[in-house]
């Protein structure tokens, strides 16, 4: 294998939560008198980081309702819609493939470690990971800071980040590791193609690094 360590983004890369995200944002838009997104294609084309800019793009006026209020409202909707949890296509196969080849696997997330651990348990994939690298166990802000602290501590021989967004590409660049992107998540292939190699799903991505 080309890498000894794989860092996985979670939402949109392993956890298939695109549909609940679309449902949640559309209900939020409707509640605030705004036009709903038409579906997956439009969602993937407008979604991005930071989230506050994404909210502006789709019409929210923070003079009317603050971003913090909207974010709290969205999380409540998301938690309702994101049931039952499901894996992205090819995710389980990818995790198993890497484990069989002795590659150490980690989750890199800006979410709560406890929440992600619970979700991994529910999905039945917790045993694949050496560690969840998140905001609860490393005192740094944002995924770049979290990843940098982990690299300093772990000193991986060779590492790659697999994610589904331009932000994942930026994080990998910031900490000096490679990155592969998948188009099954929150951004489409067209939006990602100028950044990195883009693969259909996690299994396609890991197959590319086994050659």
Indicate where each model-derived feature is located.
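Surface-exposed amphipathic alpha-helices with a cationic face
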Residues: 92-99, 151, 169-173
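Conserved Lys-Pro-Asp/Glu-containing loop-to-beta segment of HAD-superfamily phosphomonoesterases
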Residues: 5, 143-169
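Acidic, Mg2+-coordinating phosphoryl-transfer loop and its flanking beta/alpha structural elements
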Residues: 161-200
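Short beta->alpha linker loops
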Residues: 46, 86-90, 111, 138, ...
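N-terminal helical cap/lid subdomain that shapes the substrate entry/recognition surface
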Residues: 3-92, 101
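Substrate-recognition element of Asp-dependent hydrolases with the DxDx(T/V) motif
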Residues: 25, 91-120, 135
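Glycine-rich phosphate-binding loop signature in dinucleotide/nucleotide-binding domains
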Residues: 1, 101-103, 153-157
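A short, structured active-site edge motif that brings together acidic residues
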Residues: 43, 125-141
